[in-house]
């Protein structure tokens, strides 16, 4: 919401998918009610959104692309690198919902073309109620605050920071990254047993 409302002058097109988490669906629907035009991509039979679908939907006036990395219900892993490649020469803001991906796929795989990525602690055994909005290094991505009343968090969100939750998030993130390879092997073994 904050990025679209800040940057939306003259560019009113958004691309997302019909199977996003409600944390993305509802804000995009709100932007649609505000007058933004939304192209809703439908998944294939395996629950994936392809880079070709994104390329077909992309327009000159596309302001924002918001797609998930790992689906919260199906577990499908989308081609974030493919999306980034499609968007290489486009000015659209690229947001990745990475909440389900953290601790399950290597974060080194986050392409530099990603402008924003959202994470939440409880998806990798951290505390509830704390998350991170990663802002990439590309210039020009600005966010207007949705809440007002203080200058905390660089003026984007008011209120005293919950240090205990931030430390809990950071500790859980470190543990998740340390255990990533081992957990992936274990889950792969379990998947093979299930298929047998």
Residue ranges and their predicted role:
Residues 1-196:
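Pyridoxal 5′-phosphate
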